[in-house]
């Protein structure tokens, strides 16, 4: 057993080191010094995380590990209580990987670069803190910590309509946070003279069914905004349409996954009876979301908004996996979270680098881009294939596991399972339609651009490096998905056996 506070260091390091970014001395190119300082912090964080997980984490142990507990607020029983298990280790590693690459991708940012990189590191701490929290108050504070950086990144470095998008984002997420705070307060104050928000204590707490449903619904609204789940998704296309692509990488790769993680970590683990009641509705909403978002994506002229709606559609598979209440379905949902974290981040990165070169976002104005930009065309096509679940890539395995999870669920009758499976199949057909249509309208044809030197228009070493770094795990998970599933399978079995299979 390790007594070193690994998780505290991992959570606090990015924002602490980011705070000193305003005092970093530099000579010559200020932006280059700040960018590489931030990248070094991210790399150090990844090394510490990898070391702690490799040498102090037992993957076959479903219990909470590396847990720490420090008295935080003495009046109440509130603690700084981080801890990890098989559910949280994957998202934490994903956070470090995507944040590092997003920092590397942010080289074109030159205005207020100190503040920009500090906000990215602050988001890093907030996201890792959310995934490693074992106290509801700590979870809520970390959940809120990453909202303000996103708002500032969007409002200061976004597009022409950035203020509208930033305001819409903060109104939606702040509204969801009110419901989250109400749920946290209600669970902490219920049935005890001394309030407690410890996950382990709350897991053994029983509530009247009506009250448990109220708690569940409050948390669900907060997660529905963040994930997003229809009809609370409308902030996402506007945000992705205006945000800088490094911010989009963090949104699509990490922030959207926090809602699904919270749905499993809090709603499934702490409110099992309410989840059993709500799970059919999650499956229904997930099925509708797959079709609705895929159909809406096909009608988008803005190619960044088209990718954003594809993220909403893929979230539907995660909802179905969570609602299936099976080992297979829940493991598939977790795999989909990791898989789409890579794929979504890569697509927005390539969309941003394409926009930097041609300064066009509407598909009907594009065409023939494959001729001057063959490298970007190749990478964009590869990740589009991953998004439409091409066999051999991570998206295919994740959707297939979710599919098997719902058809093997003992909770649902045969006819509902057939209908849901049919809807999922339609979604799998619609995804290639909007993905391949986007590729055709962007890259094929004979339009010519007034660019004096096509060589400089194509992808450079930075774009190739970032794309390859993301593509390798996409293919690796597609070929050997047990690399991810082995982390979560024991914890998933423990959750379902403790709460649903008694």
Curated annotation (Swiss-Prot):
Keywords carried by this UniProt record: Chloroplast, Membrane, NAD, NADP, Plastid, Plastoquinone, Quinone, Thylakoid, Translocase, Transmembrane, Transmembrane helix
One example of a Gene Ontology biological process annotation: ATP synthesis coupled electron transport
Range of residues in the leader sequence: none
Subcellular location: Plastid, Chloroplast thylakoid membrane
Main location: plastid
Catalyzed reactions: a plastoquinone + NADH + (n+1) H(+)(in) = a plastoquinol + NAD(+) + n H(+)(out); a plastoquinone + NADPH + (n+1) H(+)(in) = a plastoquinol + NADP(+) + n H(+)(out)
Residue ranges crossing the lipid bilayer per the database entry: 4-24, 37-57, 86-106, 113-131, 136-156, 169-189, 210-230, 244-264, 274-294, 307-327, 332-352, 388-408, 418-438, 464-484
Membrane-topology descriptor: Multi-pass membrane protein
Single Gene Ontology MF annotation: ubiquinone binding
UniProt EC number: 7.1.1.-
One of the Pfam families matching this protein, by short name: Proton_antipo_M
Highest taxon listed in the record's lineage: Eukaryota
GO cellular component: chloroplast thylakoid membrane
Family membership noted in the UniProt record: Belongs to the complex I subunit 4 family.
NCBIfam families: NDH_I_M
Protein name from the UniProt record: NAD(P)H-quinone oxidoreductase chain 4, chloroplastic
Organism: Calycanthus floridus var. glaucus (Eastern sweetshrub)
Top-level taxonomy: Eukaryota, Viridiplantae, Streptophyta, Embryophyta, Tracheophyta
